Amino acid sequence: MSSLTLSRRPRRNRKTAAIRDLLAETHLSPKDLIAPFFVKYGNNIKEEIPSLPGVFRWSLDLLLKEIERLCTYGLRAVMLFPIIPDDLKDAYGSYSSNPKNILCHSIHEIKNAFPHLCLISDIALDPYTTHGHDGIFLNGEVLNDESVRIFGNIATLHAEMGADIVAPSDMMDGRIGYIRSKLDQSGYSKTSIMSYSVKYASCLYSPFRDALSSHVTSGDKKQYQMNPKNVLEALLESSLDEEEGADILMVKPAGLYLDVIYRIRQNTCLPLAAYQVSGEYAMILSAFQQGWLDKETLFHESLIAIKRAGADMIISYSAPFILELLHQGFEF
């Protein structure tokens, strides 16, 4: 049987692994990944989170060893989240401004141990509040301006401790401009701001809240986090944060919002981060544990999709696992 007369045969560019690699448009490397870690008081603690298999709450001593191990695989950036005991929480999140809290102490110690590492700190109140909201909660409402002033103080404190980048995750109006001003006035003009500029009110955060032992006791976060139905609002939020002085923008969650990542990428020249959140990680792990899908290729494919949509960097709980695979030369 004679061959068809075709001027173009795209399959020629897929016929061997070498050709496919040569022509690949999107690549994943250790430099693309930010590893998030939960740190708590104590010693010799590595406590697996039930809703996040393979993710742990670490005491600082063991976290330092884990970071050292991952640096041999090419780890370049970490993001820290604190586990705060209930007896240190109050309605105002006062402990967030204590320079001796576990997050401040961890920033200082990790930066001293790994000065080459990019250290990103979480700027939020929900780990420290009894009500679980991301700001001061009064009479059924999260107070915007009063909360923003606290975030400015926290950001300055983290910069003093050694954070390279502060990452406000609260979604209050005007917080980027206020934090930038506070940092500059305090002598930290070199400290960058990674803004959670587009943070949707998603159901995919539940395992993260389990990890922090932080749950909303009254109301919800829909009055300040974004409506999943909207994308033009995402463009507005990101442009406002850019105008206010953000150095890096972020979309959270990532996997269900690839269109948003793409749209923002077309509208900004700033670096763009995406957060593959706890629920995304948990869904992939659940499918693997049920024997339905392959963990290695699914994590890789999900991260490639996020990069292909336009993200320059990805925060993912799979980062330690992927770093090991990349180091081993795993063929995806």
UniProtKB/Swiss-Prot annotation:
Binding site residues for Mg(2+): 237
Chain residues that bind 5-aminolevulinate 1: 209, 221
Domain of life: Bacteria
EC number: 4.2.1.24
Active site: 199 (schiff-base intermediate with substrate), 252 (schiff-base intermediate with substrate)
Binding site for 5-aminolevulinate 2: 278, 317
Key words of the record: Heme biosynthesis, Lyase, Magnesium, Metal-binding, Porphyrin biosynthesis
Any one GO BP annotation for this protein: protoporphyrinogen IX biosynthetic process
Catalytic reaction annotation: 2 5-aminolevulinate = porphobilinogen + 2 H2O + H(+)
One Gene Ontology cellular component annotation held by this UniProt entry: cytosol
Classification via PROSITE patterns: D_ALA_DEHYDRATASE
GO molecular function: porphobilinogen synthase activity; zinc ion binding
Pathway: Porphyrin-containing compound metabolism; protoporphyrin-IX biosynthesis; coproporphyrinogen-III from 5-aminolevulinate: step 1/4
Keyword Isomerase listed: no
Pfam families, per the entry: ALAD
Cited function: Catalyzes an early step in the biosynthesis of tetrapyrroles. Binds two molecules of 5-aminolevulinate per subunit, each at a distinct site, and catalyzes their condensation to form porphobilinogen.
Assembly behavior: Homooctamer.
Similarity-based family: Belongs to the ALAD family.
Name of this chain's protein: Delta-aminolevulinic acid dehydratase
Top-level taxonomy: Bacteria, Pseudomonadati, Chlamydiota, Chlamydiia, Chlamydiales
